[in-house]
Amino acid sequence: MWELNMSYLWLAQRLLQSDRASGMFRLGVTADVAAALAALSMKQMNDLASAGQLICALRPSRYGVLSALTRATPPVDLVRVHTAMALAGLALPDEETS
């Protein structure tokens, strides 16, 4: 569990440092969560990773998304566009209900 959590936190920080907007989209997090993830120290990352609970979630929770990601592969560019479009609807929580 620790390895998976630490890998997620490390990847999250790298994505957010590289391109914050793209990282937020790929991680499916809000600006507040992105800022908190980017600001974590190594000790804080270790503490979170050691919590004994998975701190990330797989987003393809709808059959259509999972099916689109696993079907016979059409041209690579089309796969990337379709995947981005399918995940875009799941990327950020509905902020109107917050």
From Swiss-Prot:
InterPro entries: Flagellar_FlhD, FlhD_sf. One of its GO terms (biological process) is positive regulation of DNA-templated transcription. GO terms for cellular component: cytoplasm. It comes from the Bacteria. Keywords: Activator, Bacterial flagellum biogenesis, Cytoplasm, Disulfide bond, DNA-binding, Transcription, Transcription regulation. Gene3D superfamilies: Flagellar transcriptional activator FlhD (1.10.4000.10). Its main location: cytoplasm. GO terms for molecular function: DNA binding. It is found in: Cytoplasm. The C-terminal region contains a putative helix-turn-helix (HTH) motif, suggesting that this region may bind DNA. Belongs to the FlhD family. Functions in complex with FlhC as a master transcriptional regulator that regulates transcription of several flagellar and non-flagellar operons by binding to their promoter region. Activates expression of class 2 flagellar genes, including fliA, which is a flagellum-specific sigma factor that turns on the class 3 genes. Also regulates genes whose products function in a variety of physiological pathways. Homodimer; disulfide-linked. Forms a heterohexamer composed of two FlhC and four FlhD subunits. Each FlhC binds a FlhD dimer, forming a heterotrimer, and a hexamer assembles by dimerization of two heterotrimers. This is Flagellar transcriptional regulator FlhD. The lineage of its organism: Bacteria, Pseudomonadati, Pseudomonadota, Betaproteobacteria, Burkholderiales.
